[in-house]
A protein has these predicted regions:
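Short glycine-/polar-rich loops that comprise or flank the Walker A/P-loop
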Residues: 1, 53, 101-102
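Short, Lys/Arg-enriched, disordered terminal segments
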Residues: 1-5, 82, 139-140
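N-terminal beta1-alpha1 ligand-phosphate binding loop
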Residues: 1-27
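Short hydrophobic segments within beta-strands
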Residues: 6-8, 58, 88
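Conserved strand-to-helix beginnings and helix N-cap segments that scaffold or border functional pockets
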Residues: 16-21, 67-71, 118
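S-adenosyl-L-methionine/SAH cofactor-binding core of RNA-modifying enzymes
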Residues: 29-86, 94
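Short Gly/Pro-enriched loop/turn and capping motifs at secondary-structure junctions
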Residues: 63, 91-95, 110-112
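Structured adenosyl-cofactor binding patch, chiefly the S-adenosyl-L-methionine
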Residues: 97-139
């Protein structure tokens, strides 16, 4: 499965970007997780509505999920041969109406800067990959 994180606005080249790159590299080293590609991009010109794609919007009012919920989602999507999982992180003002039809999830009740939300999401995807491959990183 290919996982993409689409972000509105600039992608800064600071410490947050370095951390994201570390987690991306670690995730891709765990081939048995089923995650074949993980990348961060600027917002696409159009949203992907393919039936082989799952789109999730990060929203403070979205469904609160935990790590094991995300693991279950990735496992189910892999089992159902879904090719792409897209996460969308918007601007502080929120999203346009183009994203209304997508499921909304939240990283928690706290508010994070968007650059830090990217890091947290990359770490959680890596954590999911370690759980799926029985790697000792995750301690439950």
């Amino acid at each position: 499965m290919k996982i993409s994180i689409f972000c509105e606005g600039r992608l800064n080249k600071g410490l947050e970007n370095e951390l994201c790159n570390i987690y991306i590299k670690r995730t891709l080293s765990l081939k048995k997780s089923g995650i074949l590609n993980l990348e961060i991009k600027n917002k696409p010109n159009k949203t992907n509505n393919s039936k082989n794609t799952k789109n999730l919007v990060l929203d403070e009012k979205g469904k609160n999920i935990n790590t094991m919920d995300l693991v279950g989602m990735i496992k189910t999507l892999n089992n159902n041969r879904i090719e792409s999982l897209n996460f969308y992180i918007g601007k502080p003002e929120g999203f346009s109406n183009n994203y209304e039809k997508y499921e909304k999830i939240s990283l928690g009740k706290m508010t994070f800067p968007h650059s830090l939300a990217r890091v947290i999401l990359c770490e959680q995807i890596y954590r999911c990959a370690t759980i799926l491959t029985n790697h000792p990183y995750h301690k439950s």
